[in-house]
């Protein structure tokens, strides 16, 4: 019987991917990003190791949600003080901090432990089409989140 071998973290090469979020659906995009961060798209995937790649998301301000979610979806945050709960709709948060929408969606799809926090540091989200990671030579990754669409 052959033994199962674990991937050596020193020999794993981490790729950098650029994903354009313009016109993409938020949840479907976030699940694809989480899968890449986790490394589930690779044959070397191991549940307890960080075998995933780095992901750069550009045009985060152009991500879309369907239905009435732009007015009805709310984001909560709390200052930690009594009465410190702040509630904000998708539209208002998108106008104020569009990167946070994609970050929160992806973070919710990662493990809730130290590995998940480590994986989250490999996600870079930018609201414009420019990013400061050209030196890493990122590869463009096309994700189609609209079923039947040509996007």
From Swiss-Prot:
Source organism superkingdom: Bacteria
UniProt-listed InterPro entries: Ribosomal_uL13 (IPR005822), Ribosomal_uL13_bac-type (IPR005823), Ribosomal_uL13_CS (IPR023563), Ribosomal_uL13_sf (IPR036899)
Ranges annotated as spanning the membrane: none
Disulfide bonding pattern of the chain: none
Location of region: Disordered: 129-151
Molecular function in Gene Ontology: mRNA binding; structural constituent of ribosome
Entry keywords, A to Z: Ribonucleoprotein, Ribosomal protein
A single GO BP: negative regulation of translation
Gene3D superfamilies registered for this protein in UniProt: Ribosomal protein L13
PROSITE patterns, alphabetized: RIBOSOMAL_L13 (PS00783)
GO CC entries: cytosolic large ribosomal subunit
Self-association and partners: Part of the 50S ribosomal subunit.
Family affiliation: Belongs to the universal ribosomal protein uL13 family.
Function: This protein is one of the early assembly proteins of the 50S ribosomal subunit, although it is not seen to bind rRNA by itself. It is important during the early stages of 50S assembly.
UniProt name for this protein: Large ribosomal subunit protein uL13
Lineage start: Bacteria, Bacillati, Cyanobacteriota, Cyanophyceae, Oscillatoriophycideae
Gene name for this UniProt entry: rplM
């Amino acid at each position: 019987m052959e033994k199962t071998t674990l991937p050596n973290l020193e020999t794993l090469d981490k790729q950098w991917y650029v994903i354009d979020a313009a016109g993409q659906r938020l949840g479907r995009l976030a699940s694809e990003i989480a899968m890449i961060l986790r490394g589930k798209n690779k044959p070397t995937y191991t549940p307890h190791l960080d075998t995933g790649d780095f992901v750069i998301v550009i045009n985060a301000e152009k991500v879309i949600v369907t239905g009435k979610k732009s007015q009805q979806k709310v984001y909560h945050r709390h200052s930690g003080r009594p009465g410190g709960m702040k509630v904000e709709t998708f539209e208002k948060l998108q106008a104020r901090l569009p990167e946070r929408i994609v970050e929160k969606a992806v973070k919710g799809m990662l493990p809730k432990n130290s590995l998940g926090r480590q994986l989250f540091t490999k996600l870079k989200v930018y609201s414009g089409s420019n990013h400061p990671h050209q030196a890493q030579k990122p590869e463009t990754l096309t994700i189609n989140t609209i079923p039947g669409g040509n996007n």
